[in-house]
């Protein structure tokens, strides 16, 4: 389910444009928190599975690297489970480091987390139709939502914006 944030602020003081700006900042905050491996409750994400698995070469979101080729050659075996698959297959550039559990493998899901709606009354952040599986991921590792720290930052941002208008 998408996350909805509603405001009880006089319409003369708060516009859809204000909500859109705040929604963009909130979205960036969620993505940053997620990249640090922290869930919507401010806790570290549950570790990735170490149960051995096979990943098909065809149809995988990200081409499997590392691991052991299967007897048929159509898949790759990872003794260390999804944790090993992710570690071996993810892009390792010279950029910044992220947490081990950051919910990014190909980048598809997190890049499809968007501001879906912004009105004077609030905004909605959710996943596009291309990454609906992210809602199932959210059941195990709650990333869609606002941590207590996120709520404080959001409240302070609204307060600062309103003080500037009064």
Sequence positions of predicted segments:
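Short, Lys/Arg-rich flexible segments
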Residues: 1-166
């Amino acid at each position: 389910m998408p996350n909805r944030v509603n405001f009880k602020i006089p319409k003369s003081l708060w516009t859809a444009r204000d909500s859109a700006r705040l929604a963009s900042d909130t979205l960036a905050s969620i993505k940053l928190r997620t990249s640090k491996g922290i869930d919507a409750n401010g806790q570290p994400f549950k570790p990735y599975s170490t149960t051995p698995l096979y990943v098909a070469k065809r149809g995988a979101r990200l081409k499997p690297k590392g691991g052991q080729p299967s007897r048929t050659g159509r898949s790759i075996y990872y003794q260390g489970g999804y944790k090993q698959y992710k570690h071996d297959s993810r892009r390792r550039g010279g950029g910044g480091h992220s947490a081990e559990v950051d919910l990014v493998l190909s980048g598809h899901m997190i890049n499809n987390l968007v501001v879906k709606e912004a009105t004077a009354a609030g905004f909605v952040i959710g996943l596009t139709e291309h990454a609906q599986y992210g809602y199932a991921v959210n059941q195990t590792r709650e990333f869609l939502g606002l941590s207590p720290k996120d709520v404080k930052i959001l409240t302070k941002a609204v307060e600062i914006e309103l003080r500037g208008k009064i």
